[in-house]
């Protein structure tokens, strides 16, 4: 009767890893553009999230996708779901 497939309703965001100094944790910077309500200019807003990285595979500069999850610790409620693009080494 009810053969529908469950879809994940968890939020996903894509951002850049700015710190991986903690064990099994990375800091991800998410940037988005918002139109200023009065002046109409597009302004870049940013926010940092702590995300759980179980295998310690992410490095600084990597582009990753994070997914909302249950709280892992006091400041972590996101987990790294996949690596979108590795950082380029110059």
From Swiss-Prot:
<dbReference type="InterPro" id="IPR012340">
    <property type="entry name" value="NA-bd_OB-fold"/>
</dbReference>
<protein>
    <recommendedName>
        <fullName>Small ribosomal subunit protein uS17</fullName>
    </recommendedName>
</protein>
<dbReference type="Pfam" id="PF00366">
    <property type="entry name" value="Ribosomal_S17"/>
</dbReference>
<dbReference type="InterPro" id="IPR000266">
    <property type="entry name" value="Ribosomal_uS17"/>
</dbReference>
<keyword id="KW-0694">RNA-binding</keyword>
<comment type="subunit">
    <text>Part of the 30S ribosomal subunit.</text>
</comment>
<keyword id="KW-0687">Ribonucleoprotein</keyword>
<dbReference type="GO" id="GO:0006412">
    <property type="term" value="P:translation"/>
</dbReference>
<keyword id="KW-0689">Ribosomal protein</keyword>
<comment type="function">
    <text>One of the primary rRNA binding proteins, it binds specifically to the 5'-end of 16S ribosomal RNA.</text>
</comment>
<keyword id="KW-0699">rRNA-binding</keyword>
<comment type="similarity">
    <text>Belongs to the universal ribosomal protein uS17 family.</text>
</comment>
<dbReference type="GO" id="GO:0003735">
    <property type="term" value="F:structural constituent of ribosome"/>
</dbReference>
<dbReference type="GO" id="GO:0022627">
    <property type="term" value="C:cytosolic small ribosomal subunit"/>
</dbReference>
<dbReference type="GO" id="GO:0019843">
    <property type="term" value="F:rRNA binding"/>
</dbReference>
<dbReference type="InterPro" id="IPR019984">
    <property type="entry name" value="Ribosomal_uS17_bact/chlr"/>
</dbReference>
<dbReference type="InterPro" id="IPR019979">
    <property type="entry name" value="Ribosomal_uS17_CS"/>
</dbReference>
